[in-house]
Amino acid sequence: MNGDDAFARRPRAGSQIPEKIQKAFDDIAKYFSKKEWEKMKSSEKIIYVYMKRKYEAMTKLGFKATLPPFMCNTGATDLQGNDFDNDRNHRNQVERSQMTFGRLQGIFPKIMPKKPAEVGNDSKEVPEASGLQNDGKQLCPPGKPTTSEKINKASGPKRGKHAWTHRLRERKQLVIYEEISDPEEDDE
């Protein structure tokens, strides 16, 4: 129950990192430049270790898993972690986005709540995906509004004070309720 125990278990800045964790860090370090790796906190490094482990586990089980974005850019560094000096790889380093903890949120798909279908619209909705999941390709031209934008524009003014009323259904037959008395009250 003592809060000081948590600090005792946490590795200190000057302490040695266990060999197992260091080996996992070395496996991940080859995907980043030396500068990027030095800037990263250990918590970010651990996240990348787990991402790689999960990817490898899924592929070993036979599932088609997408390659984590940081693993796609193997050409930026050599095995010793030294940056290449030729123009092609330098351009790749500049073009690829720097993976930081804040950008990890964009990797995972955003879960969008399902919107109720409009009357007369029998088409099924397709969930939207984040930009990184689509490999940077836009699904529709930038000038044209997407289907979800069209739905939002069309249904925007209709949704007023009682947005939930369209979910109610009208009863076809009237239901007559009878008052049922408790058996204990009948005995009296």
Curated annotation (Swiss-Prot):
Q: Where is the KRAB-related domain?
A: 20-83
Q: Where is this region: Disordered?
A: 114-165
On this chain, the residues bearing Phosphoserine are S123
Which domain of life does the protein's organism represent?
Answer: Eukaryota
Database matches in Pfam families: SSXRD
Alphabetic keyword roster:
Phosphoprotein, Transcription, Transcription regulation
Cite a GO CC annotation.
nucleus
SMART domains reported for this sequence: KRAB (SM00349)
**GO BP annotations, alphabetical order:** regulation of DNA-templated transcription
Keyword Kinase (UniProt): no
Which family would the database say this protein is a member of?
Belongs to the SSX family.
Described function: Could act as a modulator of transcription.
Identification of the protein by name:
Putative protein SSX9
Originating gene: SSX9P
